[in-house]
A protein has these predicted regions:
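Blade-level signature of beta-propeller repeat domains, shared across WD40, Kelch, NHL, RCC1
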Residues: 144-170
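Beta-propeller domain segments
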Residues: 1-126, 132-138, 164-170
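Short alpha-helical basic/polar micro-motif
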Residues: 72, 141, 159
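C-terminal structured "cap/appendage" subdomains that terminate the fold
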Residues: 129-149, 153
Length: 170
């Protein structure tokens, strides 16, 4: 996209569903709220009332993720194996929660981009590392496009590197 992007593991101890982790493009000199605010002008209750002059300057991230999913690495898909609409999209590893009553994450998500911009949505792409009973057997860490266009995902839960290939029509 020509822009700098990042994924952020937001703060803990505000509950199961706060604060959302996120993926966003980075604006030079931009203020994303830390440590006083999150997701726009929402005060962290531990800093309530501090720095009111910054409240309206907080940039809202492009894509909000489930809280505590621990987005660790992302790549922009530059292969040709997957359907054409995946070209340039973000694939991000979600390592998984450690401090929620119900686990979340443990997957790879796809963030569709249009003209280098995110719409705010993401899609589950590679799942199954978390069983319906809540047992974890894998934790995605790294994600990269292989020379053949497949997606490689490292997993420190099982000690594996997974290759995701597309075999359908393009």
């Amino acid at each position: 996209t020509g822009a700098l992007w990042c994924s952020v593991n937001e703060r803990d101890w505000l509950g199961d569903n706060l604060v959302p982790d996120y993926i966003t493009h980075v604006t030079e000199g931009g203020f994303y709220g830390w440590p006083w605010f999150y997701t726009g002008g929402h005060w962290d209750p531990r800093h309530q009332g501090k720095h009111p002059e910054l409240k309206n300057k907080v940039i809202v991230p492009d894509v909000l993720l489930q809280a505590h999913t621990a987005s660790l690495q992302m790549t922009f898909y530059d292969g040709s194996q997957f359907p054409a609409e995946y070209k340039g999209d973000i694939f991000a590893s979600q390592h998984g929660s450690w401090n929620r009553s119900v686990r979340s994450g443990y997957e790879v998500v796809r963030v569709p981009l249009k003209n280098g911009k995110a719409s705010g949505i993401y899609q589950d792409f590679l799942t199954g590392f978390l069983t319906p009973a809540g047992d974890v057997w894998g934790r995605p860490v790294g994600v990269a496009t292989a020379p053949d266009g497949s997606l490689l995902v490292s997993d420190d839960g099982s000690g594996s590197v997974w290759r995701v290939s597309y075999t359908g029509s393009r």
